[in-house]
Amino acid sequence: MHPGIYETVLRWIPEKSRVLDLGTGDGAFLARLVQTRRVTGEGVEKDSALVARCVERGLTVHQSDIADGLDQYGDNAFDFVLLLGTFQELISPAEIIREAFRVGREVIVSYSNFAHVRVRAQILFQGRTPVTRSLPAPWYRTHNLHFLSLLDFQEFCRDLGVRETNRACFNARGAVRFLPNFRAEEAVSLLQANSILSHSITVERGEAKKETYQI
């Protein structure tokens, strides 16, 4: 992942925020958030070896996949939920985003841009699934399940009822502001739920409480 993404997320998250990092990895970035932004941070990671690395860093990390990991948190438990480098690996990204907004106020998502000029060129001239700096693994070894462009992600947010309040795009040369869907290799977006999604989540919470009372 481009280092500019990490620097951007550091700027977006205020000090002393409550942060949940989904797909924590070895915990290096979450530890940096704790140290530099003084956040209260927790993580979810399914790889036991990586969880052990997180524990060595003094982090609170739960071993679970992302879908099951979110179930253990109550409503509005966090200010920010992070999906950095894991969004395209999700089986049901819309469901995870909705659940992330249940437990958090804002969601930060990073993803690779499948409409980058090099990706287009490899498909057009080579007729093969592209391999690039941001998509380094061949199709049979990649963890990615979804291949999307910046425009696709914008449409996804609109369909889901989510506002993209900020976005930063990057390629090998640095930040990209002009023609990002064509020139950017990676992007990170700051998301907020609009009133429609917020109402839907609130209704679902109410229905869940009713079912609990009936039991």
Q: Where do the model's predicted regions map?
A:
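Conserved alpha-helix/loop element of class I SAM-dependent methyltransferases that forms part
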Residues: M1-K16
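Class I SAM-dependent methyltransferase "Motif I" SAM/SAH-binding loop
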Residues: G23-G25
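S-adenosyl-L-methionine-dependent methyltransferase catalytic module, highlighting the catalytic core
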Residues: E95-E99, E106-I201, G206-I215
